[in-house]
């Protein structure tokens, strides 16, 4: 059902079963016409928790004033500082507000476990939430997200035919989005983390994901079963391919959120 929490529009799905009531937030980067399809592709049927599908700021059905033309202007003017970073930063701020509101409205315990799912830019938002950690996060699934701002900018250059001009301000911003460098922040409390890359995903370089894995692994030395990286064959970077990772994501979140 369509809902709102903390002033943020979202789709909300009740659990088919639940124990003490956790919550899964899925960051949705899909266009307006794909909003319902995103939620249908990721039902998380085994997870005994409420699911909230939260649109990313500045994209999809949360486009800025001016719509697609304004998004295009930002892409070409300064993709990182005017589009990507504001979208990710606002998403992390939204997360804390939405979770607080939903816990009150749905009568969830204050310490009910929180799981995240993010695809593409939504995956970057989930990684940033793990690194900044505005609220405790028990588990996360990241799909089709690069390891840092440089990879995201390179993908945008290929997709939109732009040449990005790196400025000192952009370099400062990129440091916050350098997730291998922030591995110790991401791993605080050893949240259960599953990272999935499609073998055919040209937007996410395998070398970058390997670097993220190498940076995170030492932080999970005492809990190796809580960190998993998977490369799946026959999967690229399309929203229409999320169904191919749905079962894996469902299993992971179910395993790590229902022990509570």
Where are these regions (language model features)?
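Primarily recognizes the serine-hydrolase "nucleophile elbow" in alpha/beta-hydrolase
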Residues: 97-159
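Short, flexible, mixed-charge acidic loops at enzyme active sites
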Residues: 62-77, 155-159
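Alpha/beta-hydrolase active-site loop
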Residues: 72-106
């Amino acid at each position: 059902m369509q809902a709102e929490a903390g002033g943020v529009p979202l789709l909300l799905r009740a659990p088919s079963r639940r124990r003490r009531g956790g919550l899964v937030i899925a960051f949705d980067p899909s266009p307006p016409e794909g909003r319902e399809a995103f939620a249908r592709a990721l039902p998380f049927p085994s997870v005994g928790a409420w699911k909230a599908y939260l649109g990313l700021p500045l994209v999809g059905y949360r486009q800025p004033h001016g719509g697609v033309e304004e998004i295009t202007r930002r892409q070409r003017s300064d993709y990182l500082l005017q589009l990507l970073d504001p979208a990710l930063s606002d998403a992390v701020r939204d997360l804390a507000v939405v979770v607080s509101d939903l816990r009150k409205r749905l009568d969830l315990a204050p310490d009910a476990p929180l799981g995240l799912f993010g695809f593409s830019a939504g995956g970057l938002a989930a990684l940033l939430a793990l690194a900044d950690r505005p609220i405790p996060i028990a588990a996360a699934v990241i799909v089709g997200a690069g390891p840092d701002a440089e990879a995201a900018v390179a993908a945008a250059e290929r997709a939109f035919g732009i040449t990005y001009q790196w400025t000192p301000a952009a370099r400062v911003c990129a440091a916050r989005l350098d997730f291998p460098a922030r591995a110790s922040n991401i791993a605080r409390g050893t949240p259960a983390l599953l990272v999935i890359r499609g073998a055919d995903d040209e937007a996410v370089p395998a070398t970058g994901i390997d670097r993220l894995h190498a940076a995170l692994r030492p932080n999970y030395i005492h809990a190796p079963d809580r960190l998993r990286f998977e490369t799946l064959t026959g999967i690229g970077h399309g929203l229409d391919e999320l169904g191919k990772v749905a079962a894996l994501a469902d299993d992971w979140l179910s395993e790590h959120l229902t022990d509570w």
